[in-house]
Design a protein with these regions (language model features):
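Internal helix-loop-helix
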Residues: 17-88, 128-135, 147
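Structural signature of FAD isoalloxazine-binding scaffolds in flavoprotein oxidoreductases
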Residues: 33-43, 103-107, 183, 189
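A glycine-rich, basic-preceded beta-loop-alpha segment at the flavin cofactor/substrate interface
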Residues: 38, 158-169, 178-201
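Residue-level signal for inorganic ion chemistry
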Residues: 42, 73, 122, 154, ...
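Short Gly/Pro-enriched turn/cap motifs at secondary-structure boundaries
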Residues: 84, 99-102, 126-129, 143-145, ...
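A short, Trp-centered hydrophobic/proline-enriched beta-strand micro-motif
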Residues: 87-95
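A short core secondary-structure module
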Residues: 108, 117, 121-165
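A structural signal for short hydrophobic beta-strand segments in well-ordered beta-sheet cores
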Residues: 111-112
């Protein structure tokens, strides 16, 4: 796992079949709804064999899965959350930036409204699984004058024009879960891709 830079596809599918990606996600969306204690047990047991493997489980159960579960439309849940539970798609959570860290209020990624669309420019750094993911939940400022209250979350698919991924970071460990930047250059996203409400990320 550490040498190849990811867990094998066969193992990934088995993890999905065993509902590792949906320990905290309700059954109606493909999870098992067992809660956080169960997730901690799963993580602890996985870590005995591979710490990298735990990162594949953490994201869909927390930073990626819960925002979609709690704030996504039913269409977004069916399109993104359910396939992640099945192991058909991988997603990631993109907040951290080179100059702002994880402080959303000082980030430099900007989403400019253009009719029913938003034009997004910026760079996210140290994003877990960025080289592997099919989509990302990206945070961008839709109103810079409002600081943290002007931040909006967008679901952006990897094949959207202007979306690219940087080279994987050279790390001291946990290399089985690659980390890289996500670069957004004039990425055009429809308003239907907003996660939750504008300015309420």
């Amino acid at each position: 796992i550490e040498e190849t830079g990811r867990i094998p596809k066969e193992l990934y599918r088995k993890m999905a079949q065993n509902q590792y990606f949906g320990v905290t996600i309700p059954e109606e969306y493909g999870g098992c709804g067992a809660g956080y204690v169960a997730m901690a047990i799963v993580m602890e047991e996985l870590a005995r064999a591979s710490v990298s493997a735990t990162l594949y489980v953490t994201s869909p159960n927390t930073l990626l899965g819960l925002p979609i579960l709690n704030y996504g439309t039913e269409e977004q849940k069916e399109k993104y959350l359910v396939p992640v539970m099945k192991g058909e798609k991988e997603g990631t959570f993109a907040l951290t930036e080179p100059s702002a860290g994880s402080d959303a209020a000082t980030q430099n990624t900007i989403a400019r409204k253009d009719g029913d669309y938003y034009i997004i420019n910026g760079r996210k750094a140290f994003i877990t699984a960025a080289p592997l993911c099919d989509f990302a939940v990206v945070f961008a400022a839709t109103d810079v004058s409002l600081g943290a209250r002007g931040i909006t979350a967008f679901i952006i698919e990897r094949d959207t024009p202007g979306y690219s991924v940087g080279q994987p970071e050279r790390k001291m460990g946990v290399n089985g879960s690659p980390t890289a930047d996500i670069i957004l250059e004039n990425v055009k996203v429809h308003k239907s891709q907003i996660l939750g409400e504008e300015g309420k990320a």
